């Protein structure tokens, strides 16, 4: 479970308790992991932080340099479309995959939804070759932290994920650095939830991720909820859609009872 920008694992856990309970009821063996991103987000990185925090001036006058408990998987470099801190996040996620996995799937919100799509992409067969090709044209290098030439999964540290879910997520855009995440299209089944009243993430940015996924606009893979920038974790219709998606993926791809939802591995 990958939290959004300026959140933390414990905060995201608290906000999605209802969703966790529903998933545990549907999948009794499920256990959700809530890592906190490695990049500390400072006050200066948060738009209008001082205006929205009345205690900010008091902290300054007392000489207290309190920073918010805010973290991110990356942050923008000025107003550009280049992200800083991404390498640290991939190294951190790789350690979680190795120490806590293997995982069946990954779920993320907002920036975490964007990261979830990237992680699903990175673990796909032949994605490394796409990065090698893109690197020659200004693309970023495939993360070395995801490589294991002695491993059992085609030189990677973890097998391909069975599914990914993005709530209010987005794609990194058309910058050459990030092209290989999305070209060729992400083959992992991805479910995208978008809020019709979301004013934080532009719809076109979210649809970039949708269209970068194979079957991204297939029925049941793109779902709008009548709200804003949040996870509809207590609304039965949308929780049911998530559970149905996961069941279809796990049961639909199983060849034996051992692979069924009752024996589902720990999702990320």
PLM-predicted stretches and their roles:
Residues 1-102:
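Serine-hydrolase catalytic machinery in alpha/beta-hydrolase-like enzymes
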Residues 2-4, 168, 194-195:
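The conserved beta1-alpha1 loop
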Residues 14-16, 177-180, 202-212:
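Short alpha-helix in the alpha/beta-hydrolase fold that links the catalytic acid
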Residues 107-116:
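Gly/Ala-rich beta-loop-alpha elbow adjacent to hydrolase catalytic centers
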Residues 171-174, 196-202, 228-230:
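Acidic catalytic loop of the alpha/beta-hydrolase fold
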Residues 186, 191-194, 198:
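Short beta-strand/loop motif that positions the catalytic acidic residue
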Residues 213-232:
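Catalytic histidine neighborhood in serine/cysteine hydrolases
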Residues 233-246:
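Post-His helix in hydrolase/transferase enzymes
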């Amino acid at each position: 479970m990958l939290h959004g920008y300026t959140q933390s694992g414990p905060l995201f856990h608290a906000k999605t308790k209802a969703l966790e309970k529903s998933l545990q009821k549907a999948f009794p063996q499920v256990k959700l992991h809530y890592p906190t991103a490695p990049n500390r987000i400072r006050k200066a990185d948060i738009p209008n932080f001082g205006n929205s925090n009345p205690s900010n001036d008091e902290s300054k006058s007392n000489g207290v340099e309190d920073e918010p408990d805010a973290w991110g998987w990356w942050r923008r470099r000025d107003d550009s479309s280049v992200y800083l801190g991404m390498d640290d996040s991939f190294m951190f996620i790789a350690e979680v995959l190795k120490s806590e996995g293997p995982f069946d799937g990954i779920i993320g919100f907002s920036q975490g939804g964007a990261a979830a799509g990237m992680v699903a992409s990175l673990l796909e067969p032949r994605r490394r070759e796409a990065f090698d090709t893109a690197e020659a044209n200004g693309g970023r290098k495939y993360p070395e932290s995801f490589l294991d030439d002695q491993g059992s999964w085609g030189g990677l540290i973890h097998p391909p994920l069975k599914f990914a879910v993005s709530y209010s997520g987005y794609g990194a855009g058309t910058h050459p650095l990030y092209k290989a995440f999305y070209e060729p299209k992400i083959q992992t089944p991805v479910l995208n939830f978008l809020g019709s009243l979301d004013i934080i993430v532009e719809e076109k940015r979210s649809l970039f991720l949708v269209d970068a996924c194979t079957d991204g606009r297939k029925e049941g893979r793109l779902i709008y909820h009548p709200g804003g920038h949040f996870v509809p974790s207590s609304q039965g219709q949308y929780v049911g859609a998530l559970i149905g998606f996961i069941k279809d993926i796990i049961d639909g791809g199983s060849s034996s009872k051992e692979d069924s939802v009752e024996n589902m591995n720990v999702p990320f």
